[in-house]
Structures are given as structure tokens and as C-alpha cells.
């Protein structure tokens, strides 16, 4: 069984980036579009081509793709509830992952939390869209997900087995020199990758490293780590083509990753 996932991050409510994404989704025909944080932008930020929050929800909810998956970035803050309210939940689900998984046939997608920025609005909306918070804790009166991955990631790995080490989505990248500067990385996620050794991680957050060094991937041990952070004059994204031996959750036999606009590939063949 084959599945195609298009991964993108850091659209920041840019009208031009939304339009470019629509064109690419129409051309690539993915089964899933995975938004790896910062589809919205801080409303206090000046931006010439900013799309309104309600318009952003309308544009993204109408993408011609069977499934859309979101993880939080540091800019999903006070406008996120407005985005959710404008989303046509009766027509298509809004899958918002935070320390949880989403299963598409044989593919198990793990969505990491993002604790940078004001995260409470995100957590407040999760019950409204039918997504659960795994092992949430009370911290100074706030309901949040623990920053310690032992509270939520380890139970997911135990529950779903090796299939849960296929694709991890995390806005803040692990510490991989080729895809992000050290201050943009999350050392906790680095430790999680080193411990559980997933096949593939996809991040954003650092917009500059891919453009400055013309790189989009690196390795942390046996794990291939991608940065699909924002381009300026074009859309940066990756298409992931998975080949699975069966239709129930399992590890793929092959993953072909193609990065755009570079049009270069990496092939992952699990041992």
C-alpha cells in the first residue's frame, strides 16, 4: 500500500504562500497534508500580504486533499480559537495533534507539542475538534501537555509499537546542524530522537538555515531530519512517498522524500 504526504511549515498567514500551496497540492495529489506549525502569524506582526484568520481557515479547509493534519507552532496563539471557529468542522475534521497520533491506514503520524509562545489557546480548542490530550498535567493552574516526553511519547511508543517510529512532526527541530541553528532547536526532542530512533522527523521554525546554506535535511544517528520551513520567493515543502507491506499500522518498506524547490531526493529503506 502506498501513501503520499505533503509536509509544509511556517506559512505565517501569507496569501502568496497559501496560493502556492494550493497549486502544489493540486499538482502533487497527496493523501495527507501535514502542517508543521505556524500556519498562522502573531497578529501584532506587520505583514503586507497577511490573510485574515477566518479567510485562512476557509482557504486551508478547501485544499483538495483527503486529510489535513496540524501540529502547533509558536505562532498558533490567540488567533487559533478564531481559526478553529471558522473551520467547517461539520464538513471535514480538523486534526490538531499535540502529543498524540493520527493513523492513516498503515501510517502512524506522531504530532509533538510546541511549548514556545502562548500555548493555552491551542489546548482549549482540542476538545472542540474531538482531539484528545494525552496525559495532560496541571501546571500553575493551566492545562498543558508536559514538556517531558516521558509523560506522553513513551506510552504512545508502547501502544503502537514500531509503527509509531515512522513519521514524527515537530515544529521545533532536533539539534541537527544542517537544518537549524542551535538556538532554534529543542534539546528534549533531540533526546527523544536519539532514544527512539524514528525513521523520519519533519520540522520548521528556523526559516533561515535552508535558504542560507541551501540545505533541507540532515541526520541524527539513523534518523533523517527534514526542515520544511518557509521560503521567501517560493514555497519550501517535502513530498513523502511511503510504501507499506500491508494496510494495518506497520513500518514502511521504503520512503522516498523529495524536497521542493530543490527537486532533490532522499530514499529511506528501513533495515
How should these model regions be labeled?
Residues 1-6, 101-111, 164-167, 216-225, ...:
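Beta-strand-turn-beta hairpins that frame and shape the catalytic cleft
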Residues 7-10, 33-38, 67-74, 95-99, ...:
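Active-site neighborhood of phospho(di)ester-bond hydrolases with catalytic His/Asp-centered motifs
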Amino acid at each position: 500500500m502506498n501513501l503520499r504526504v505533503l509536509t509544509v511549515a511556517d506559512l505565517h498567514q501569507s496569501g502568496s504562500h497559501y496560493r502556492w500551496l494550493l497549486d502544489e497540492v493540486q499538482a502533487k495529489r497527496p493523501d495527507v497534508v501535514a502542517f508543521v506549525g505556524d500556519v498562522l502569524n502573531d497578529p501584532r506582526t506587520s505583514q503586507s500580504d497577511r490573510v485574515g484568520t477566518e479567510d485562512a481557515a476557509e482557504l486551508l479547509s478547501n485544499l483538495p486533499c483527503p486529510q489535513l493534519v496540524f501540529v502547533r507552532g509558536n505562532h498558533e496563539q490567540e488567533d487559533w480559537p478564531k481559526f478553529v471557529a471558522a473551520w467547517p468542522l461539520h464538513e471535514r475534521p480538523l486534526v490538531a495533534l499535540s502529543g498524540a497520533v493520527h493513523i492513516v491506514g498503515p501510517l502512524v503520524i506522531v504530532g509533538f507539542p510546541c511549548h514556545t509562545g502562548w500555548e493555552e489557546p491551542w489546548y482549549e480548542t482540542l476538545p472542540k475538534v474531538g482531539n484528545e490530550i494525552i496525559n495532560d498535567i496541571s501546571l500553575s493552574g493551566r492545562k498543558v501537555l508536559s514538556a517531558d516526553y516521558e509523560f506522553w511519547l513513551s506510552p504512545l511508543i508502547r501502544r503502537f509499537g514500531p509503527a509509531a517510529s515512522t513519521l514524527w512532526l515537530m515544529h521545533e527541530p532536533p539539534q541537527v546542524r544542517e537544518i537549524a541553528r542551535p538556538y532554534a532547536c529543542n534539546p528534549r526532542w533531540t533526546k527523544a530522537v536519539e532514544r527512539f530512533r524514528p525513521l523520519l522527523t519533519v520540522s520548521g521554525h528556523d526559516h533561515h538555515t535552508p535558504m542560507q546554506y541551501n540545505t533541507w535535511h540532515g541526520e541524527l544517528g539513523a534518523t533523517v531530519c527534514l526542515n520544511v520551513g518557509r521560503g521567501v520567493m517560493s514555497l519550501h515543502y517535502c513530498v513523502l512517498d511511503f510504501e507499506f507491506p500491508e494496510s494495518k499500522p506497520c513500518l514502511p518498506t521504503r520512503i522516498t522524500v523529495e524536497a521542493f524547490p530543490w527537486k532533490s531526493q532522499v530514499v529511506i529503506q528501513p533495515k
